[in-house]
């Protein structure tokens, strides 16, 4: 009988550890208290001259299409086939006139507090990382959504 109780206790401890270990970085990245979470879906054609910067590895472009993010989306060409998309609003500021991110090479900088965030992983020294969006490449079309 003691053996059965001990097995149940060990199983319970394992379940508790497993559940607590499942806190996802994506949950933290996408539950930013400063940036509203709303749905959108936009497409861009990489063949258009406007998006020529994105045809090359490490290409970066701020797109500001209607409905795409709060202040637009910053797209980053990771390796020619994989792209990252981030909200173009400072992740650690209440949205204001100074909270649109500036592109600086492979970083974006928040003009409000001068904090830099890496486009490679979306992180900087502040509490909240950049809010990321989903990107799917189909031929020369990028679909960006949240």
What is each model feature region?
Residues 1-6:
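N-terminal secretory signal peptides that target proteins for export/translocation
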Residues 7-15:
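Sec-dependent signal peptide recognition
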Residues 10, 22-26:
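Long, non-catalytic terminal segments
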Residues 17-21:
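C-terminal motif of bacterial Sec signal peptides marking the signal peptidase cleavage site
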Residues 25-105, 118-119, 134-146:
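N-terminal pre-ligand scaffold of iron-sulfur
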Residues 104-114, 124-137:
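Short cysteine/histidine-rich metal-coordination sites, predominantly Zn2+-binding motifs
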């Amino acid at each position: 009988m003691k053996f059965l109780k001990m097995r149940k206790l060990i199983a319970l401890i394992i379940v508790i550890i497993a559940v607590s270990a499942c806190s996802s970085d994506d949950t933290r990245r996408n539950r930013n208290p400063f940036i509203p979470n709303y749905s959108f879906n936009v497409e861009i054609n990489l063949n258009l001259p406007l998006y020529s910067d994105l045809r090359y590895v490490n290409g970066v472009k701020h797109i500001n299409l209607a409905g795409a993010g709060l202040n637009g989306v910053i797209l980053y060409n990771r390796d020619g086939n994989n792209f990252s998309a981030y909200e173009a609003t400072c992740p650690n500021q209440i949205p204001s006139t100074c909270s649109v991110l500036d592109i600086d090479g492979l970083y974006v900088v928040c003009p409000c507090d001068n904090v830099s965030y890496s486009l490679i992983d979306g992180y900087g020294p502040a509490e909240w990382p950049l809010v990321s969006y989903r990107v799917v490449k189909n031929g020369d079309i990028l679909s960006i959504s949240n």
